[in-house]
Design a protein with these regions (language model features):
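Charged, alpha-helix-forming regions
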Residues: 1-37, 42, 46, 112, ...
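Charged, amphipathic alpha-helical segments
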Residues: 7-15, 57-62, 70-74
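Short linear motifs in intrinsically disordered
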Residues: 15-23, 55-58, 76-81
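Short C-terminal domain-edge/linker segments immediately following a structured domain
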Residues: 43-46, 60-63, 78, 118-123
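Core segments of alpha-helical transmembrane spans in multipass integral membrane proteins
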Residues: 46-53
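Short, structured motif recognition centered on aromatic/hydrophobic residues
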Residues: 53-56, 60, 116
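Amphipathic protein-protein interaction modules
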Residues: 64-107
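Mixed-charge, glycine-accented linear interaction segment located at domain edges/termini
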Residues: 95-127
Length: 127
């Protein structure tokens, strides 16, 4: 497991490929939500530029709005420390133009914020 968030929602980001030409990481993203008799699960692959990853971590460390997006704007993870909210969304379009979209919003307490911050700061960067 490369990056794992377990509170307030389960999100796993595993690196499956690296591109040194355009510094970027291909992540296998898994999001699992289970509460109040509701269950949703998302599994997809997304390319994220290393610069976007660094900016996301930097903003989190400064207590600012932090946004992690893939290169196609199909995946987004937003940590808003002022509002105390974690938002996520995943979208995939098939070859016929059909779209599947999953998204969620979760309240964050201080422990969850610190756990997310630790998970991203502990990721060993190669760039």
């Amino acid at each position: 497991m490369d990056i794992e968030i377990t509170n307030p929602v389960n999100i796993k980001l595993d690196v499956i490929k690296l591109d040194e030409h355009v510094p970027s990481l291909k992540f296998s993203v898994s999001i699992s939500v289970e509460k109040f008799g509701y269950k949703a699960e998302v599994n997809a692959h997304f390319w994220i530029e290393c610069q976007c990853f660094d900016q996301f971590v930097s903003c989190m460390n400064c207590g600012e709005l932090a946004i992690l997006k893939d290169v196609n704007d199909s995946f987004e993870l937003i940590l808003n420390p002022v509002a105390g909210v974690l938002n996520w969304s995943c979208m995939k379009e098939d070859i016929n133009g059909g779209i599947s979209l999953s998204k969620g919003s979760e309240k964050l307490d201080d422990a969850a914020k610190q756990s997310i911050l630790r998970a991203f700061n502990d990721y060993p960067k190669w760039w």
